[in-house]
Amino acid sequence: MSLPTLKSAWRPALRMAAGGVLLLGLAGTALAQVDTGKSTISAVSKQMNVPVDGKFKKFTASVDFDPAKPAAGKAQFSVDVASYDLGDESFNKEVRGKDWFDAATFPNATFVSTAIAPAGAGAYSVSGKLTIKGKTSDVVVPVTFKQDGANQVFDGVLPIKRLQFNIGQGEWKDTSVVADDVQLKFHIVSAAKK
């Protein structure tokens, strides 16, 4: 049996996992409407020790954050896993499949915050529930915050293990080909409520 190109199968799965983690980071966003045109969610993984980076093109978010009252903050995010883009449609199609994200069965990865705590110097720890491919895990996302005029900007990276979420099944469980570690990265821009 011939396997799909390693890059095609591995990239999408890692990106999907990253998307879920990024959702966690987004949970630290603001009293605001998220500007998805200025915001990004991506996943970085390694295939045969070569970094692979993909972006989620579609996501929605509901956030409420005031840096003066971080404990009162909350966020919910949903990422369309079929929107994961590795820059090649054949790769994108592979990662949407059953062995990777199984987008037909599990169309969205979600994050719902449960607590936000200050971590010093514009940093926050955002705790919440990350769900990818039907598997839910408690996570803590380190998030940095800065005020940029009327906008609030949140950045962060959440490391996850793809196999914990059943991303990369069958022959793709082999972590010597596609690493288990995935970095979910996010840059979220939101405009304060008026």
What residue spans do the PLM features occupy?
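Bacterial N-terminal signal peptides that target proteins for export
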Residues: 2-20
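C-terminal segment of classical bacterial N-terminal signal peptides
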Residues: 15, 20-31
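Low-complexity, acidic/polar, glycine-enriched regions of mature
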Residues: 30-194
